[in-house]
């Protein structure tokens, strides 16, 4: 839910209050990603380790008619691998066999927010990770202030993999 509603800040800055709201569908509603009446986050039991955010839009106006996030089961395993590999040198929590729920929850929130970006029509912005110099990413003051390793949620730079044990950064 929070990964969806993280977009509220951007919409409010553009003048749209409550533009995107995440709600649990009632049990009486059977909706899936093919039902144009609902925009849903759909869990798919699959060996695939990914997520995606497709949308249907009116080519005449650009209006998004319906948008979904498809969340495959094994995305959790790839997130765990990314956290362990990219932050294990500085993050003691990432060195555990089972990662803490708080760490995995933040990772899932990031992916949900990223995929909602795709549902809103945004493409990857891989140049965003070049916005911050390496020495800044190794600065505890900078990383505490910025709370991010890239200037866009649409980049894949989810974790600070340039931080070194002597930098004092633990995430």
Give residue ranges: language-model regions.
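Metzincin-family zinc-dependent endopeptidase catalytic domain
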Residues: 3-119, 145-149, 159-162
């Amino acid at each position: 839910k929070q990964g969806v509603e993280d977009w509220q800040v951007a919409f409010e800055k553009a003048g749209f209050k409550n533009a995107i709201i995440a709600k649990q569908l009632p049990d009486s509603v059977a909706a899936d990603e093919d039902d144009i009446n609902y925009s849903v986050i759909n869990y798919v039991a699959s060996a695939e380790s990914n997520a995606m955010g497709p949308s249907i839009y009116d080519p005449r106006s650009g209006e998004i008619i319906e948008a979904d996030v498809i969340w495959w089961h094994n995305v959790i395993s790839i997130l765990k691998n990314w956290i362990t590999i990219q932050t294990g040198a500085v993050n003691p929590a990432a060195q555990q066999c089972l990662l803490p729920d708080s760490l995995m929850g933040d990772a899932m929130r990031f992916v949900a927010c990223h995929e909602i970006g795709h549902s809103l029509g945004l493409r990857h912005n891989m140049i965003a990770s070049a916005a911050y110099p390496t020495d800044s990413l190794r600065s505890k003051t900078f990383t505490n202030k910025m709370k991010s390793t890239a200037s866009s949620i649409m980049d894949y730079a989810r974790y600070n993999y340039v931080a070194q044990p002597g930098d004092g950064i633990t995430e």
